[in-house]
Amino acid sequence: MSGINWEAEDAKYIWHPAMQMKDNEVFPPVVIDHAKGCYLYDTHGKAYLDIISSWWCNLLGHANPEINAALKQQVDELEHVIFTNFTHKPAIELARELSELLPAGLTKFTFHDNGSSAVEAALKMAFQYQYQTGHPERTRFMCLPESYHGETIGALSVGSMDLYAKIFHPMLMNNIHFKGLDCYRCPYGKTRETCGVECFEDAEAAFKKYGKETVACIVEPILQGAAGMRIYPAEYLRKLRKLCDEYGVLLIDDEIAAGFGRTGKLFAIEHAGVSPDILCTSKGLTAGYMPMSLTITTDKVYDAFYDDFGTHKAFVHSHTYAGNPMGCAIALTVLKIMKRDHILTKVNENGKYLHEKLMQALGSHKNVGEIRHIGLIHAIELVENPKTKKAFDPSRRIGWHIFRKAMDLGLVLRPMGDIIYFNPPLNITREDLDKGVALCKEAVESVLGK
């Protein structure tokens, strides 16, 4: 179909997510023709280094030949089947293999088709568990400040970011949102080195006041992605696990963004050495190939639903594409590659390498407040004044202008406000990391000077 203006056709029909469409008048979407490895290629042949893994999900590179082969084989055998009253080998094998890798005690798997769906399932599962174990008074959820768990109504209700939720407040559940937990701008005047997890006192106060009416506490473990790749101490999670046990509150671990090796552990909660009652995962699970998610829980939770039909205790929650065999086959291949190629070891080694390179390139820049990292994830917080940590006026859209310049240079560096970040495929080469750092430096200096 040569001669078609795809940009114009896109503008005519497509409403893109998470952006103001009017921006397209000056910065239209790039039409991608194909991708390979860490690179996207547009219809004009220009290459873009995908340093954000296409919204954090491309785990092992685009068009990975081994994953492609697994998908092609599976689609010829079984593309999909209803997952109630039926099952299939890829789903069974995936659950069996993951059960040996998960935090202790997580044994029962439910299948869904995106991160928000996994969170919705976790919330409903936790609520029904409390109800069926004699606690109908428990109707509320607790969550961390500036948390993000998806954009469906239930997920928004346990999120704390006004950017996504403010306009919908009349529709949302009345939940409990903790305060504090901003380690860059610590309200207690602490640094990461002197932190004593003082901010946990707000969580303690919330449990004392609301603990007996709370169903569950949901967390992004260690890393709060949409809040700007905020990284908080593992001790906070250890304290939270203890409080949940004390008050009979379930702990829901949202690993959708941080799981599958992003932080240097297969699951981020491993940094704290504790296990949740329910774990959600997606994104890297299928390496960005297929929409699929899992909500995984313990025998204890599962047993509260296991009863005769007439008791109506079943977990009546379903998605059409639950347990899709193609997604399961891909996920199995992802696990195989990660184990065989020692991906987690590479993540930790290359994470240190990338941090050194970014510090050399931008660590002393006049507008860099902090370069924080965990695993391969790095966030560069850009501020007007690093000494006072004063943020730029949001109307200046510093991060957005850097994004535009980076795209001109061939680097996908989509920001969160004035925070730019690296979250690349886990098998990225050091050569491509070097290229990403150089292009990032050029883009920052083009907008903010040296």
Write out the residue ranges for each language-model feature.
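Conserved N-terminal phosphate-binding loop of PLP-dependent enzymes in the Aspartate aminotransferase
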Residues: M1-K450
